[in-house]
Amino acid sequence: MKLVLKISAAAMCLVASATGLKAQGDVAMPFMAIDRSPVTSAMGSAGLASSSEIAYASFRNPAVIPFSEKKGDFGLSYQNWAPKGVKSTNLNLGATMRFGRIIGVTIGGAYQMGAKYDVIDGSGNPKGTFTPSDLMFNAGLGVKIIKNLSLGANFHYASQSLADGVSYNAVSADVFALYRVAGVNITAGVSNVGSSVKSDKTGSFSIPAAAVVAGAYTLKAGKSHSIDLALDANYYFKGGFAASLGAQYAFKDIAFFRAGYHYGGDSLMPSFASVGAGVAFKGVALNVS
């Protein structure tokens, strides 16, 4: 079994105005909507229907796993998130294994460290500093039901520490179906559907749940050249529409060049453009976005 190892680096918000997550009504834990993959983040976060990159499927769409050419995919990534906004340093891990052509499993995790701030007591005296943090764990499964149809589900646990003694947690799930016709992957489902976050002082808040449809197609020119095209559309249940369009050019599966655009509108994630590149050799890849 050939296991593809990906050691990846991702620096988000390098192009245009993607300066972090926008406030959106009473949505809690917006970090659950962040794209953790340096491959898809370079494509405007498009690629939910693509089976070419599956390391971070537990954050995205596990229904793609049975259709992937990879038997295994493992990724580590670092994100310098929102360098001009509310900064955070994100460390992400994803691992996926496919067993035969029928079933695949995926796991992942993310840890975020926010910007340290000074703590002041009720009398105005300094009490030291505090560093907010976010944590997320995932597990998922993808199963091919018939030749051209697969189903997938992810389960997430997320926690957030905003201040000393102030922390929250939530559980959620993603459910997707994927159908392949004439080489085109078409997927639809829901993401981050789950529990609300309750606060003693301000009531209950929803996590960033959305309905999603996406498509992906790979164009091949001989054995040396290929282009992956991806289009995603999200409707957030608390309001707001988002869409992503991205492309990847690959030369002999050794060198990769990527670009994309994400339209955020009034949704949680602002609009941004992104670019990226990657190299791969003997199962080890380095990707930057």
Give the predicted meaning of each segment:
Residues 1-31, 35-37:
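Cleavable N-terminal export/targeting peptides
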Residues 22-289:
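Subset of outer-membrane beta-barrel
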